[in-house]
């Protein structure tokens, strides 16, 4: 459909996004491979790809990634993952005294974590994305209460911008692999390697979108906290290298004390 609408007429089409690429290694075509496959972009006829542009923001000076390396598997040991993940989340939230946006792929995970946090005596308000409610109202509460924590999913990964001191800790609660749907399942069914050709590129694009919520201007600072152990170097999955190489933040640690020191150095 995209090919018929945009690439087979005399009208010139420009496609632009901060997350068109799902890799940083290889040729320009390699970096756009998933986009090319999904859209039928006419690279062999008259299509032109531009070199991916680096972010203008000083990510490596202003941000660090903390990621867990000791949590249960999110799907194979789901109940244990939620329990241990909540404990680690609270540790992370205490570093920044709130000021955190926590992103979820699954609404059920978000609701479970919210219920668990409500049972703890935490020194900051926990806000949650509400069905049918005005999201702008929730976001305004988050902006005004600078020590609050906001749990969200869906459009919160890419559709919001919160600058300044209200957000200095962006938490990814579980890597955002795509939820199975007919489109994803069809792509996987025709792929040579469904994991590396479909699910990992989808996850990387979503992860980049989520991480992009943290640094919204030249003065924003903070940490990204990934509550998931599947990106550790010795994990049996094959995607940790391609994932790390695709992210704009290169400073990372599994030591929560190092993340805390960095946070207090750059955020005060």
Where are these regions (language model features)?
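ASCE RecA-like P-loop NTPase motor cores
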Residues: 1-268
